């Protein structure tokens, strides 16, 4: 519903701005430019979707091997000690615990097709424990904040888009996204725990969160000792080594399960073509809307206004061109994806803005969409502090993404 209003606003605002430019400034080229943008954007959307097919097939095939090889189950076991303390209101041994573990593990691996059904199942089981059927419980809110914070280990789709948009090194945003999404998730956990008075100062949580924070701090400190060129080389090398290791580990996991790894890959890869075709209308819709908005001059007015505000406050304005992606992400995943593609098209995939838009896309998730789908599936009307905690996690991810990208790029 939110995306519907945003899409309509693109055209109505563009019409108003273009009319003002035509009537008061004598700009007779603005309407031809807007119409040309609709054709160009439609063509771009199709070409992007077509180019995604091969890489999507590759990674969906790899993910299918990992899924069938039990990697999700292994991750769930690793997360178990931490999650039992984040959800103290869930009775020990309740089956919802397994659904939550599996959902978060699937999200971390980027297995959206598996994560969503598992998440909806977890919400149904949490609703069974709910004494006020129209009001969100503490475990529901913590579960949704973990989803909206966008914790991911493998930002496959973003790397795929970067490859299609001509990035020299599509994986160079891998480490920055890992760091930014860590801060987003950490902020979400801390803020929600404060609301719910969950004690994070026990030994397990301190060791886990403290250990992860120490590792992240060490990574940031290590990169801070390098110049930009060296940092880029090391980041790129680490990202590609990790991705290659993930592929090999998934294959070994499949072999350990006596899986026909090749057939599993083919099964997953078939979904690549279907997925690429399925996103064509969504990409056409959002890219045409953004194209008209930009061609009318409205996007430049928005960005220039934010730049003026930031510069007035004495800040660096390099990040402003990527902000539309960050602002759109809590509202709509496809809208934010369109903004990310538009940023790479306008500024270049290897520009600071293009890279930052990708990190924005990977550091958080679609907060309002997730809340609507998950709460709507079980009839929750009163969401309590869920929106506040989700948006604070998003804000932490955006701030972290900006700081990290200034350091890396």
Task: State what each model feature region is.
Residues 1-54, 163-293, 311-313, 385-409:
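Signature of multi-pass transmembrane helix bundles
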Residues 60, 94-96, 136-139, 240, ...:
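Sparse, context-dependent recognition of short Cys/His-centered cofactor- or disulfide-binding micro-motifs
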Residues 25-28, 93-97, 134-137, 227, ...:
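Short, structured coil/loop segments at alpha-helix boundaries
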Residues 29-128, 257-346:
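Membrane-embedded alpha-helical segments and adjacent helix-loop junctions characteristic
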Residues 65-76, 89, 102, 106, ...:
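Short amphipathic alpha-helical patches
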Residues 36-39, 46, 95-97, 132-140, ...:
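Hydrophobic alpha-helical segments, principally membrane-spanning helices and signal/leader peptides
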Residues 101, 105, 140, 231-234, ...:
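Generic signal for short, ordered secondary-structure residues
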Residues 114-115, 122-161, 167-197, 323-409:
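C-terminal transmembrane helix pair
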């Amino acid at each position: 519903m939110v995306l519907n209003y945003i899409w309509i606003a693109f055209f109505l605002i563009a019409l108003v701005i273009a009319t003002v430019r035509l009537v008061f400034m004598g700009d007779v080229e603005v309407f031809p430019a807007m119409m040309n943008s609709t054709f160009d954007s439609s063509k771009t959307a199709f070409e992007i979707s077509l180019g995604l097919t091969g890489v999507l097939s590759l990674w969906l095939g790899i993910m299918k091997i990992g899924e069938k090889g039990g990697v999700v189950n292994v991750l769930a076991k690793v997360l178990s000690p931490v999650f039992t303390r984040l959800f103290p209101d869930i009775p020990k041994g309740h089956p919802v615990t397994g659904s939550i573990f599996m959902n978060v593990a699937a999200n971390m691996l980027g297995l959206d097709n598996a994560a969503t059904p598992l998440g909806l199942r977890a919400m149904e089981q949490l609703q069974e424990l709910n004494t006020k059927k129209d009001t969100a419980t503490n475990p529901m809110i913590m579960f949704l904040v973990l989803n909206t914070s966008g914790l991911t280990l493998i930002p496959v789709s973003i790397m795929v888009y970067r490859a299609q948009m001509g990035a020299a090194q599509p994986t160079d945003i891998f480490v920055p996204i890992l760091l930014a999404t860590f801060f987003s998730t950490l902020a979400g956990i801390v803020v929600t725990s404060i609301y719910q008075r969950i004690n994070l100062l026990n030994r397990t949580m301190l060791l886990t969160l403290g250990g992860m924070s120490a590792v992240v701090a060490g990574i940031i400190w290590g990169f801070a000792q390098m110049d930009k060129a060296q940092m880029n080389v090391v980041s790129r090398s680490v990202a590609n080594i990790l991705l290659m290791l993930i592929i090999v580990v998934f294959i070994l996991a499949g072999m350990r399960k006596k899986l026909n790894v090749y057939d599993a890959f083919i099964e997953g890869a078939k979904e690549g073509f279907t997925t690429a075709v399925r996103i064509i209308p969504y990409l056409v819709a959002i890219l045409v809307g953004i194209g008209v908005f930009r061609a009318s001059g409205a996007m430049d007015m928005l960005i220039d206004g934010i730049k003026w505000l930031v510069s007035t406050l004495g800040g660096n304005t390099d990040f402003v061109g990527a902000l539309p992606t960050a602002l759109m992400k809590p509202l709509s995943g496809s809208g934010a994806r369109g903004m990310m593609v538009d940023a790479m098209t306008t500024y270049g995939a290897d520009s600071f803005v293009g890279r930052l838009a990708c990190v924005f896309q990977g550091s958080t998730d679609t907060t309002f969409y997730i809340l609507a789908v998950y709460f709507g599936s079980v009839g929750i009307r009163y969401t309590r502090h869920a929106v506040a905690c989700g948006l604070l996690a998003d804000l932490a991810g955006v701030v972290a993404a900006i700081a990290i990208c200034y350091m890396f790029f």
